[in-house]
Amino acid sequence: RKMFAQNAVEALWDISKPTIAMVDGFALGGGCEVACSCDIRIASDRSRFGTPEINLGLIPGYGATQRLVNLVGYGKTMEMVMTGEMINSADALKWGLVNHVVEAEQLYQFTIDIAKKIGAKSSHTLKVAKQTIRTALSIGLEEGVAIEAEAFANLFDSEDKEIGVSAFIGRHPAKWQHK
């Protein structure tokens, strides 16, 4: 039976819009799993990450054993889960667990800046991009490339593609219709 927290983390993973985790401090256990469920993870230089459940006779229960493998690889996932030790933000960046590490005082603004860059794009195209990239987690390369090609072809006929090309040629910001 799934618990409320598992459902919440899965719901976060399933959001069709881009998600960003902003971590300032400890992201241990469920906190690390929530961060792993986001598309982009930004951490302060004082952040720590870990899956300490092994110290309680448990394993991560909200998807970390699966999502960490995709982020940091098999060996680092095994190390994190089996030792239960924390890693600092510098190691999290080096391992691929986070996208960026910034000074704590700059974390909020840096995260907002990334969100604004993403938010300035076509929401329709972002949704298709997220779906297409996610397919790489569950299917082979050949099938994934075919799905990407189909998504590209579909977007090529979209209103937002016309708007984007026109904006690029005219050297002005795009006014997306999100279609």
Task: List each language-model region with its residue ranges.
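Crotonase-fold acyl-CoA enzyme core
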Residues: 10-124, 157-158, 163-166, 170-172
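Extended, non-globular alpha-helical segments
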Residues: 1-11
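Short beta-strand->loop
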Residues: 140-145
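Short, charged, surface-exposed hinge/linker loops at domain edges
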Residues: 133-139
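Short C-terminal tail/terminal secondary-structure segment
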Residues: 137, 173-179
